[in-house]
Amino acid sequence: MSPSVSVTKVQVENYVFPPTVKPPASTKTLFLGGAGHRGLDVEGKFVKFTVIGVYLEESAVQFLAPKWKGKSAEELIHSVDFFRDIVTGPFEKFTRVRFILPLTGKQFSEKVAENCVAHWKATGTYSDAGSRAIEKFLNVVKSETFLPGASILFTQSPLGSLTISFTKDDSISEAGNAVIENKQFSEAVLETIIGEHGVSPAAKCSIAARMSELFKNSLF
């Protein structure tokens, strides 16, 4: 990483997201944009299910800075366009979802699919191709079991492919378990995490704070 993209690790609950990673199916080293938990209210109590780290290719800073440099973390966290620019930007992204509580692949994949479809219907972008991508995703993930500490990894190419990988510990494999060639679905997975109705407001806050500082110190 260049000095202009100097980043630190982030700890969420008992899990540490390192400052840089080399994702599966990628030749590049990505930096940690931010990380946070994802939880739900269960019978009146907030329960944390996963922790999520979002990594970006270094060129993301060069792409985003001209528009967003000078904005505070508070301004970025409330900007739908800022997170949309991250989701759709022409650079590689990598998302690691680590499980705090055990979930079956069926439970996890059906919730992701539900959120993606809701996003597409809300934006009028639901398509047959997107629906087929979701079916493939459900088939890839449904037989998995995610115990505490396990992860599902998403490597998102700017060309549109989504590489899905699984790991039971801190490791990251070089190759993925499956590839889905559908840009709409690839973007929707990240959109439903950090977009306008994203499931992890904590990750959004972390990204806004860290990226605001990176822009401030960037040469772009």
UniProtKB/Swiss-Prot annotation:
One of its GO terms (biological process) is flavonoid biosynthetic process. Its EC number is 5.5.1.6. Transmembrane segments: none annotated. The keyword Isomerase applies. The keyword Isomerase applies. Gene3D superfamilies: 1.10.890.20, 3.50.70.10. It catalyses: a chalcone = a flavanone. Pathway: Secondary metabolite biosynthesis; flavonoid biosynthesis. Substrate binds at T50, N115, T192. Pfam families: Chalcone (PF02431). Part of the biosynthetic pathway for all classes of flavonoids, a large class of secondary plant metabolites, many of which are brightly colored. PANTHER family: CHALCONE--FLAVANONE ISOMERASE 1-RELATED, CHALCONE--FLAVONONE ISOMERASE 1-RELATED. Catalyzes the intramolecular cyclization of bicyclic chalcones into tricyclic (S)-flavanones. Responsible for the isomerization of 4,2',4',6'-tetrahydroxychalcone (also termed chalcone) into naringenin. Belongs to the chalcone isomerase family. This is Chalcone--flavanone isomerase B. The gene is CHI2.
